[in-house]
UniProtKB/Swiss-Prot annotation:
Coiled coil: none annotated. It comes from Mycoplasma pneumoniae (strain ATCC 29342 / M129 / Subtype 1) (Mycoplasmoides pneumoniae). Belongs to the ParA family. InterPro entries: AAA_dom, DNA_Partitioning_ATPase, P-loop_NTPase. It comes from the Bacteria. This is ParA family protein MPN_688.
């Protein structure tokens, strides 16, 4: 199963959602293998597990540029050289700042979008769940990820700017459904404070619009909290994988969202 996390707006907890859905899958599907492929040049997936993406020896860009394994080597860096085990049953394939230039590199024919697609396909042969964290735009890496996905998760902050951007993303996704009619989409509110009228109103408005466009809308949301960043900062893990103590409420939110994603794909309720 390929799950992409997409929004062309930054700051909506996209990477946080990707890493915590992965952590929830560890709990829900312990026997199945999961991997997160980081397609965002900020490298925040690595940072979520206590890794500095700029200090890693091998990353996604090395595979794409066919960097030799060592000086004078006839063979280039492969997927196995880049995978990092970060938790039992969960690996990451990291990237770094160089991936920010993907569109320029592709235009200069250093590699092709189909090379990225091939890496994803190779991962699906080895893992039950392949999660794709994408950059905050709608450029080549994002369109490639969406074209390969079984489900696209769109986290969004319920502010006054949400509606227009979200509907444009949904319209873009509709073009991929022509080739992949089974593609599912789900909108998930993040940074939610239900004590504010604005958040309540925007959520209801987006939900209504989503249903009219045959797009799933999560029954659960991610509450506004600083605990997720604290978990990464102190424990070098997403909040879904740290000790429950004071984090149980937020762990439950991600767990329920993950169940909805699985149900959407397995039973087609959209």
């Amino acid at each position: 199963m390929i799950i992409s996390f997409v929004n062309n707006k930054g700051g909506v907890l996209k990477t946080t959602m990707a890493t915590n859905v992965a952590g929830s899958l560890v709990k829900l599907c312990p026997e199945q293998r999961k991997v997160i492929l980081d397609l965002d040049g900020q490298g925040n997936v690595s940072a979520s597990f206590g890794q500095n993406p700029e200090r890693l020896n091998n990353t996604l860009i090395d595979i794409l540029l066919k960097v030799p394994k060592f000086n004078g080597a006839n063979s280039s860096i492969e997927i196995d050289d880049c995978l990092l085990p970060v938790y039992e049953g969960l690996d990451i394939l990291p990237c770094n700042f160089e991936l920010n230039f993907a569109d320029i590199d592709i235009a200069r024919k250093k590699y092709k979008a189909s090379d990225i697609a091939e890496i994803v396909k190779q991962l699906t042969r080895r893992y039950d769940f392949v999660l794709l964290d994408t950059p905050p735009n709608m450029a080549t890496l994002v369109s490639t990820a969406m074209s390969l996905s079984d489900v696209i998760v769109i986290p969004f902050e319920p502010d006054q700017y949400s509606m227009l951007g979200l509907m444009r993303i949904v319209e873009t996704i509709d073009t991929f459904k022509e080739k992949n009619p089974n593609l599912k989409t789900i909108l998930v509110p993040t940074k939610v404070n239900m004590r504010t009228r604005l958040h309540n109103d925007v959520i209801e408005l987006v939900k209504s619009k989503a249903h009219k466009n045959n797009v799933a809308f999560s029954e659960h949301f991610v509450s506004l909290t600083s605990k997720s960043s604290a978990a990464v900062g102190y424990e070098k893990l997403p909040i879904s994988l740290v000790s429950p103590t004071s984090n149980k409420k937020y762990q439950t939110e991600y767990l329920e969202i993950t169940k909805e994603i699985l149900n959407l794909v397995n039973h087609g309720h959209q």
